[in-house]
């Protein structure tokens, strides 16, 4: 039987939340450290299902990892060559592990099988596989064409140095290729075919690669040039920023409840694009204060939360939180350019529409957009299905701040990125029940 969690109608206390480490940074950092020619001590690493899958894979590939504390470990780099050239890797539903490992292993070559949960086998990877094959990689589909599971064999250097890749389904494909090609020691040029979505995630990749000694030339997000003789050299210590996507729930809570909420672990100089979520809240009624290591959101009670019509391509994960904020506006709100939601942990446009309707909202879906007209009062005790999607669970917790109780099915799906989320959320709230 599915476990559920009832959140009573609640008010928010003025609060400060220490964010868990960023998933995007944690998994990129683990792989780059493993491929470096020296050791790297990583601090504030996210402890979650997705990072566990990456750590398990690196262990199977022969990477030496010392666990120094719960959120601190030392990765001993392999010099860009994994010791184990044969492995069977289960990667769950962790796209930030599956895509970059696919590219790294395909470029290095070996005898590898990569697979995951059923949903991972429904998430496309064909655009990445096509690009890797142009670079001489041996990538074979073991099930449906263009989808995992995959077998990876030996790469044959065919001399091709210009690699086209599509970026309109997932920016993780480009991230994976960028991180992998320096392992060849050859100069490469990656050329985008069509639109590149979620550019801020590419910025994270490029900034982290630079911290590990590889400078990529970015020509307007159309062409990326990787220098010859590149190799990864890790910083001795690296501190992982807090997760800006996870920050969105607490910052939105401050706006909805008109109560100051501060998150620590990110700030004005964060390398994560999702910090722009706070700027979007400011446009619709929030007061935002930025520090070097914090962001704080509040709202005067007399100021209404304004409706919005937003192109959310730059903040695809955090934009989900705005779908719940829409319920506090009293007017129709629209999120556009969110086609990537369709191929995430679930079809997030369909899932969000289904669950918002349970609350009494009128919702219209398009291929890459969602229009939300809130009810006067959300339906109390609506039972929200979460589709094994951590962000669905965390988003809908905010409904309890709209003066109605809500029931969240499978709350433990948050273990993917934020295992303690509901404990933290409950500690910030007061209930009348």
From Swiss-Prot:
BP terms from Gene Ontology: amino acid biosynthetic process; aromatic amino acid family biosynthetic process; chorismate biosynthetic process
Pathway named in the protein's UniProt entry: Metabolic intermediate biosynthesis; chorismate biosynthesis; chorismate from D-erythrose 4-phosphate and phosphoenolpyruvate: step 6/7
GO molecular function: 3-phosphoshikimate 1-carboxyvinyltransferase activity
Record flagged with keyword Cytoplasm: yes
Pfam families tied to this protein: EPSP_synthase
Species for this entry: Neisseria meningitidis serogroup A / serotype 4A (strain DSM 15465 / Z2491)
Alphabetical list of Gene3D superfamilies matching this protein: Enolpyruvate transferase domain (3.65.10.10)
Transferase found in the keyword field: yes
Catalytic activity: 3-phosphoshikimate + phosphoenolpyruvate = 5-O-(1-carboxyvinyl)-3-phosphoshikimate + phosphate
Role played: Catalyzes the transfer of the enolpyruvyl moiety of phosphoenolpyruvate (PEP) to the 5-hydroxyl of shikimate-3-phosphate (S3P) to produce enolpyruvyl shikimate-3-phosphate and inorganic phosphate.
Subunit annotation: Monomer.
EC number: 2.5.1.19
NCBIfam families, A to Z: aroA (TIGR01356)
Residues binding phosphoenolpyruvate, per UniProt: 23, 95, 123, 172, 348, 391, 416
Root EC class: transferase
Transmembrane segments: none
Record-annotated active site: 317
Binding-site residues for 3-phosphoshikimate, renumbered to this chain: 23-24, 28, 170-172, 198, 317, 344
UniProt keyword annotations, A-Z: Amino-acid biosynthesis, Aromatic amino acid biosynthesis, Cytoplasm, Transferase
Entries under SUPFAM superfamilies matching the protein: EPT/RTPC-like (SSF55205)
Compartments (UniProt record): Cytoplasm
Family: Belongs to the EPSP synthase family.
InterPro entries to which the protein is assigned, alphabetical: Enolpyruvate_Tfrase_dom, Enolpyruvate_Tfrase_sf, EPSP_synthase, EPSP_synthase_CS, RNA3'P_cycl/enolpyr_Trfase_a/b
Protein name listed in UniProt: 3-phosphoshikimate 1-carboxyvinyltransferase
